[in-house]
Amino acid sequence: MIDVAGPPDLILKDTAPGHLAASLYLSVGGYDASTRNITEMAVSFSSQGRRIRFVADETLTCNGVALPRGGGTFDAKVPTDTFAGKLVTCNYRSGPSLGTIAFTAPVAPAIVSPQENSEVARSARTPVTFRIGGHSTMFYVIALGPDSKAWSDPTGTRPTQVLLDTRAFSQGPGFVALNQFFDLPDLHSTGFQSVELHGQAVQQIGVTWR
């Protein structure tokens, strides 16, 4: 999930949380049925602006879920219901040292209508009703036809519907998707130098344009 170009990862002799800045990545949902109800959580750490590579016994657990470690990143994919709408507390351990990251996880966004695998009439004002998840910073709705696309950047604080111009679409299979970026207003940490978030959520359904 995390792909960062730059200098080689830093190996520290002391990886106590007081030496580290934490970066939390949350990706909720996906573009197909296999990922729609999956949340990926990844946590990486840096020191003096360089990513850390762990080589000792460091561990990270979030609400009892142990995140597997790869190099300097702890990363796990879980059913979205595992964390959605709940207070999540992540405990990082390095030897006797403990640091925590806590936040309320967002619920998944949803496309309420049209329904999955339904037939949708092409028109100048094709309605898409949706629910955003959590505290959104930016999002958009997009409709894809066999050879065209239409999208909208909804306005307002919590809109629930957009109208898309799908007249240029050909008949046939397509998709409707909601892509959302979010923050976590109550995100905080104990023991670390700092904590930051990168959050994104996606929901997509298949439809047939007629």
Residue ranges and their predicted role:
Residues 1-107, 139-146, 152-155, 160-210:
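Ser/Thr/Pro- and often Gln-rich low-complexity regulatory segments
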Residues 34, 117-124:
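Short, solvent-exposed loop/linker segments at the N-terminal edge
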Residues 42-49, 126-134:
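Aromatic/hydrophobic beta-strand junction motif of beta-rich domains
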Residues 109-116:
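Proline-enriched interdomain boundary motifs that mark the N-terminal boundary
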Residues 122, 126-129, 137-138, 160-162:
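Secondary-structure-rich domain cores
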Residues 126, 130, 143-148:
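Extracytoplasmic/cell-surface-exposed regions of Actinobacterial cell-envelope-associated
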